[in-house]
Amino acid sequence: MATVLDTPVAVRRAAMDLLARREHGRAELSRKLRQRGASAELIDPALDRLAEEGLLDESRYLESFIASRARSGHGPLRIREELAQRGLPRADIERALGACEVDWSAQLREVWRRKFARLPQDAREKAQQGRFLAYRGYSMESISRLLNGRSDD
């Protein structure tokens, strides 16, 4: 039986339940609460209060999201796009990506090593490896450097 989110207490409880599972951005949390039937008049004050109490923190969400995606082998371009699709401001995304302590070059090499482990032998293999790494979110410049056997760290 679905819970009715028609009171401030019910909306707050639902928001806290979602935040207990993992960090959420404000836009994502608002969308999930609307999907569960809460009205904007109840959602906004509840989220404002959670933010004041430090339970809803965009910077903590960004840090958590970036770390999670980086551990999964995704590069900065893909992470940037996913965060933008989730409604986060570009300036905040850029700040968080700049502050993260991920060595994107080392991560690119590790993702490539796990998947391919050897330099491409012909143009077809090079294109295949390049497409895979580009899909994962790495820059064409970094990919080209790696696949051409140069490590300009």
From Swiss-Prot:
Keywords: Cytoplasm. InterPro entries: RecX_HTH_1st, RecX_HTH_2nd, RecX_HTH_3rd, Regulatory_RecX, WH-like_DNA-bd_sf. It is found in: Cytoplasm. It holds the Pfam family RecX_HTH2. It comes from the Bacteria. GO terms for cellular component: cytoplasm. The keyword Ribonucleoprotein does not apply. The keyword Cytoplasm applies. Modulates RecA activity. Belongs to the RecX family. This is Regulatory protein RecX. It comes from Pseudomonas aeruginosa (strain LESB58).
